């Protein structure tokens, strides 16, 4: 048996999240996209990777099930940068809890998420899976226009409320894989 030396530390910060039937899940999806979504402009990517070069990859993800949900922030970093990365991550979460988004920030975030959804909807397999999942959960089909309308209806107050419910440090668990 040969054990490999792992230089990097893998981090996971997580919390339970809204289930698939909770109306607040749309606001959390938008917050998730702003915080650590696939765009290079996500807040965690800018804070940890672009400004400081502390991580190669940082992302957050959200999964909603019928009875619960899961929210997770993931990144890998060098052992000496773990504390700095954690402090910066919690600083971004606090910023999302304390500062209401401006109307231009909110509009840009909505536009980005809707754009990502539209691009994903060009894939027939993604469309079929999405329709099947929606029908199984809700016994109805929501087309792209309905989803976009739900995102467009979100307000800065909605996001602030959800950020305060979801991103409080006392509810988050941190796992460091060595």
Label the predicted regions:
Residues 13-16, 45, 49-98, 103-154, ...:
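M16 family metallopeptidases and their MPP-like homologs
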Residues 39:
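Conserved phosphate-interacting/catalytic interface
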Residues 29, 159, 174:
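Short, conserved catalytic/metal-binding micro-motifs enriched in Asp/Glu and His
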Residues 155-164:
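Low-complexity, intrinsically disordered Gly/Pro/Thr-rich segments
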Residues 21-24, 33, 137, 152:
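Extended, charge-rich low-complexity interaction segments
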Residues 1-12:
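Single conserved hydrophobic/aromatic residue that forms the stacking wall/gate
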Residues 13, 23-35, 43-48:
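Active/ligand-binding-proximal structured segments within catalytic/core domains
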